[in-house]
Design a protein with these regions (language model features):
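N-terminal binding-site loop/beta-alpha segment at the start of enzyme catalytic domains
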Residues: 1-78, 122, 137, 143
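Conserved, mostly hydrophobic/aromatic
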Residues: 6, 16, 36, 43, ...
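Active-site mouth loops of central-metabolism enzymes
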Residues: 20-34, 83-93, 122-127, 221-232
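Short, acidic/polar
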Residues: 29-43, 91-107, 156-166, 234-240
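Active-site groove signature of glycoside hydrolases
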Residues: 104-126
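Beta/alpha (TIM)-barrel catalytic core signal, keyed to glycine-rich beta->alpha loops juxtaposed to Asp/Glu
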Residues: 119-298, 302-311, 315-318, 326-331, ...
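Local cysteine-cluster metal-coordination motifs and their immediate loop/turn environment
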Residues: 295-310, 345-361
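Short Fe-S-cluster ligation motifs
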Residues: 325-353, 377
Length: 377
């Protein structure tokens, strides 16, 4: 395992993200605990010492699973991260209540790393509003040893992140960004990394494989990979890209099965950043594919808890993208037709509640209307 220095610590270069644990019957809220425990144990015994969870992951069950299975190991033998769920504005006045409950769920007296979760356009004003006292409370917990390192994650624009840094930057020790070779330009990740480098803030990476989208390659992108590094796996290219980005300390991957976990750990046995024209060649070919592709959903499921109709939004977006990419066909209409009528895109009421929490800023209501018109249901 490659290790990175962070202050006085040595962190595994790869961390286990606990947002996409194995689940039962496709239900995101029902974690397959036996499979998850096996993954946690394998990660722990094969060099991973950083585990990342959050209040809302797996409908609130990720922290419970983290606590149940990590607590079997000495507390000083691993690093645990969680986050304050400010992506939901109704939580802003509940920081103490939520923090105390998180400690209970995770069966720990402290968090090694704690984050303001998802700083973006929809919550920046609330995060910075002194009436909630969020920063003051978290700094007090740090003073009391219940938070060892304080940081933030962000899906917002460069301008929003700069506002956050202007207000709280001197207290931030790390920043978690959506970073991969697809988003280097598409989501302005390059500019965000430069902002962190300038501020001297280490970068934590989320979505290194873009929700699994970068685990496969085709066309010119695949040909380029095969020509440049024929021995490297497609997911390996995503991690080698990140090993090339200045300021990256931690790469978090939300792995869903043992096969993914073992493969990624194997990749992180070595540090092999891209060289020569590999970096730009990879990005250029991905940019071209992105221009041809559909909506950039990562299936994070933030949207589903904010849909009053209970629509399976990530699944519908995936089918929409498939329908667009193939220029029609029968697969999407067949799949949607097999769904209960109340789960189809035509049932979207256009409230845009989902759009308020979408990290990718997808215009979901417009997609639903477009999809409905295309397939007639």
């Amino acid at each position: 395992m490659v290790y990175r220095e962070f202050q006085e610590l040595k962190l595994s270069g790869l961390g286990l993200g606990m947002m996409r644990l194995p689940v039962l019957d496709g239900d995101d809220g029902r974690v397959d605990e036996a499979a998850a425990a096996e993954m946690i144990d394998y990660a722990y015994h094969n060099g991973i010492n950083y585990f990342d969870t959050a209040w809302g992951y797996h409908d609130g069950n990720s922290e419970l699973v983290a606590g149940k299975y990590l607590s079997r190991y000495p507390r000083d033998s691993y690093y645990l991260a969680s986050k304050f769920p400010g992506y939901d504005l109704s939580n802003m006045d509940k920081v103490e209540e939520i923090f105390e409950r998180q400690l209970e769920k995770c069966r720990t007296p402290y968090f090694d790393f704690y984050l303001f979760h998802n700083v973006y356009e929809g919550n920046i004003d609330a995060y910075l509003d002194p009436q909630y006292g969020i920063l003051e409370y978290l700094l007090k917990q740090k003073e009391n040893g219940r938070i060892r390192h304080l940081g933030f994650s962000a899906h917002g624009s460069v301008e929003v992140i700069q506002r956050f840094l202007d207000a709280y930057g001197k207290h931030m020790e790390f920043c978690q960004l959506q970073l991969n070779y697809m988003d280097w330009h598409f989501q302005n990740a390059q500019e965000k990394v430069a902002l962190m480098n300038k501020a001297g803030i280490p970068v934590w990476v989320m979505e290194p494989l873009r929700g699994g989208k970068l685990a496969q390659a085709s066309g010119e992108l695949a040909a380029f990979m095969q020509s440049a590094r024929p021995e490297e796996t497609v997911p390996g290219w995503a991690f080698r890209f990140l090993q090339s980005v200045p300021g990256v300390t931690m790469v978090l991957s939300g792995m869903s099965n043992m096969e993914q976990l073992k493969a990624n750990i194997a990749t992180y046995e070595t540090d092999e950043p891209l060289v020569g024209d590999e970096f730009e060649g990879l990005v250029e070919r991905m940019d071209e594919e992105t221009r041809k592709a559909g909506l950039p959903c990562t299936a994070c499921h933030y949207c589903t808890s904010h849909c009053p109709k209970g629509l399976p939004i990530p699944e519908l977006i995936s089918l929409y993208n498939e329908h667009k990419a193939t220029g029609g066909g029968f697969i999407a209409p067949m799949a949607v037709g097999s769904m209960p009528e109340e789960k189809r895109p035509a049932n979207c009421i256009g409230c845009r509640g989902c759009e308020q929490v979408c990290p990718q800023q997808i215009k979901i209501s417009e997609m639903m209307a477009d999809f409905t018109s295309m397939i007639g249901m």
